[in-house]
From Swiss-Prot:
Entries under PANTHER family matching the protein: FERREDOXIN (PTHR43112), FERREDOXIN-2, CHLOROPLASTIC (PTHR43112:SF3)
Species this protein is from: Capsicum annuum var. annuum (Red pepper)
UniProt binding sites for [2Fe-2S] cluster: C39, C44, C47, C77
Cofactor dependence: [2Fe-2S] cluster
Subcellular localization, as worded in the UniProt entry: Plastid, Chloroplast
Family, per entry: Belongs to the 2Fe2S plant-type ferredoxin family.
Role noted for this protein: Ferredoxins are iron-sulfur proteins that transfer electrons in a wide variety of metabolic reactions.
Lineage of the organism: Eukaryota, Viridiplantae, Streptophyta, Embryophyta, Tracheophyta
Database matches in Pfam families: Fer2
Protein's name in the database: Ferredoxin
Cofactor binding description: Binds 1 [2Fe-2S] cluster.
KW Electron transport (keyword) present: yes
Length: 97
């Protein structure tokens, strides 16, 4: 399946289709968009975003704790869309405080 992903970036919203077996960060780059990242392995906070709607599978990541996951934090480098999803990007500073 493929889902509509909407990313709310500081430069405005971007939208693209993302298969459910492709990480959102990878698909965003494939679509020509530059997003922040560092490790690409779900073990840092560079690519962190916040889910504004929809659902993702990010079980490949290990940086976020259960509370952060419940609050809607997402690491786009290890997130597969599970529905149409809207994510606010560039949120690392807010996450790590």
């Amino acid at each position: 399946a493929s889902y509509k992903v909407k990313l709310i970036t500081p430069d405005g919203p971007i939208e693209f289709d993302c298969p459910d077996d492709v990480y959102i960060l990878d698909q965003a780059e494939e679509a020509g968009h530059d997003l922040p990242y560092s490790c690409r392995a779900g073990s840092c906070s560079s690519c962190a975003g916040k889910i504004a709607g929809g659902a993702v599978d990010q079980t490949d990541g290990n940086f976020l704790d259960d509370d952060q996951l419940e609050e809607g934090w997402v690491l786009t480098c290890v997130a597969y869309p599970q529905s149409d999803v809207t994510i606010e990007t560039h949120k690392e500073a807010e996450l790590v405080g």
